[in-house]
Amino acid sequence: MEIEKNYRINSLFEFYEPLLTNKQKAYIQLYYADDYSLGEIAAEFSVSRQAVYDNIKRTEKILEGYEAKLHLYHDFVERNHEVDAISDYIKQNYHGDTQLIKMIQQLVNLEADSE
């Protein structure tokens, strides 16, 4: 469960980072991506552990709120599932069609570039 939460928060952070304040960005980056403890972050910013904890929890809610309204992460995951399903179908049924395979790869590359 904890790994899934970390993955989700990191993913939401990638999509919605520009909408956060510098302090929110720093705390989330250090806590989730860099695996700092609350105490380490508190020492870095000369604040209490409770202040860091409150800021991180508030930012998690903000990220989830953005996702609830904008669905960027959900839509990204759904598109990837669909592209994977199409790719698998093409490989099974049209494995000799190099043009079709190339077009799907271009679609995958477009999605990767937009991250």
Swiss-Prot record:
Q: Which domain of life is it from?
A: Bacteria
Coiled coil ranges: none
One matching Pfam family is UPF0122
Record's Gene3D superfamilies?
Winged helix-like DNA-binding domain superfamily/Winged helix DNA-binding domain
InterPro entries recorded for this chain?
RNA_pol_sigma_r3/r4-like, UPF0122, UPF0122_fam_protein, WH-like_DNA-bd_sf
Role = Might take part in the signal recognition particle (SRP) pathway. This is inferred from the conservation of its genetic proximity to ftsY/ffh. May be a regulatory protein.
What PANTHER family has UniProt attached to this entry? UPF0122 PROTEIN CBO2450/CLC_2298 (PTHR40083), UPF0122 PROTEIN YLXM (PTHR40083:SF1)
Q: Which family does it belong to?
A: Belongs to the UPF0122 family.
What protein does this entry describe?
A: UPF0122 protein lp_1634
Q: What is the lineage of its organism?
A: Bacteria, Bacillati, Bacillota, Bacilli, Lactobacillales
